[in-house]
């Protein structure tokens, strides 16, 4: 998949590819909304590989809108994009899947002065409670919410998810190496579920200075090529 990205500033990284792989295990279908779509990478990969899914994206930064539209066009994927702050998105339409790689840099991390980076990275732009409340209002009954986040916020995530009557069903932590602390957590939650939480085997990125076999498989499956340009 060819993906156009801005020449400078925020670019997608491997977190989005890992999230795509995690979402894939739940066989997405029906109406799917990608929150904070950026250049469209997560939603477009799902639209490419799951033919029974109708992909929508919401992105508030005009800077990214034209890249997401261009990427949908060149990859010939049907993709409807809303330019909106997610918290202000109209609620008439309901979704079977909501997925997101949201901003999650915590308070206390030195903030960029670049407005695009500021909006794309920092959790203060999409607080957990507000985020989850909005998701709960946009999901159909017994639907799926799948996202990644800073693993140090896992306790806060569990508390906030419970407040909106959703249940975490599956969790996978990502580690750069086997002996390193987790750098990412990927979470599958549902509304109306009574399932016990499953903690999946961790996703290990590197082993002895090379990518693990699983990571190589993810990169091969996603098959993305990035083109930095100015649109």
Enumerate the language-model features and the residues they cover.
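SAM-dependent Rossmann-like transferase core, predominantly class I methyltransferases
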Residues: 1-31, 37-39, 44, 48, ...
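Conserved beta-strand segments of alpha/beta enzyme cores
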Residues: 2, 54, 78-80, 167-170
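Conserved Class I SAM-dependent methyltransferase catalytic core
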Residues: 3-4, 8, 12, 126-182
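Residue-level signal for inorganic ion chemistry
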Residues: 19, 101, 131, 189
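Glycine-rich, phosphate-binding/catalytic loops in enzymes
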Residues: 20, 114-117, 163-164
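Conserved SAM/SAH cofactor-binding pocket of Class I
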Residues: 21-91, 97-111
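Mobile active-site "lid"/loop adjacent to the S-adenosyl-L-methionine
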Residues: 103-130
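SAM/dcSAM-binding transferase cores
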Residues: 181-231
